[in-house]
């Protein structure tokens, strides 16, 4: 074989090898893009799941419907702004689907309502600034208004792990509290005897 033919053959082989290398590099780059994309999606899913858990920790665990029974010693309000049977609008969001819901007042009581923070007895996440626990739902509270920072034992069972939990008083408010029936604006679920909503959290329908 002449030197010229041998040279051309080598050059042709070299060009073919370069094409193969470029093709392989392209496949490698494409695979890398897919891997990185999959990792990103997986992380997003994990973050989304965590966020959903955080959002639901204080809402979804709340017992939506409750008993019409009230704590011993709780006094009915003699002249509430919203009488039993009144149709009202809820302007607070203790639970998802609550704000903006139409409700019916099923009870009205004069008491002291507290915002509390506590760690559930069932090992759940700490609940900060829960609204509301009333005077009659706190162990040995008597008639004396409790002060921010006071440590108390809860006797309410609005949420799982609440009853028997040690809590800290965040704030106190003498007010009329209401028990209401309403239909969730998000799920359509009928919630009966929700405890509690304060007078400031309601408006006339």
From Swiss-Prot:
Keyword Magnesium (UniProt): no
Record's compositionally biased regions (Basic and acidic residues): 47-66
InterPro entries in the record, alphabetically? DUF1541 (IPR011438)
Q: What UniProt keywords are attached to this protein's entry?
A: Signal
Is the keyword Phosphoprotein in the record? no
Q: Where is this region: Disordered?
A: 44-82
Name the source's superkingdom. Answer: Bacteria
Signal peptide interval: 1-40
- Name the chain's protein: Uncharacterized protein YdhK
Q: Organism source for this protein? A: Bacillus subtilis (strain 168)
The organism that produces this protein has a lineage beginning with: Bacteria, Bacillati, Bacillota, Bacilli, Bacillales
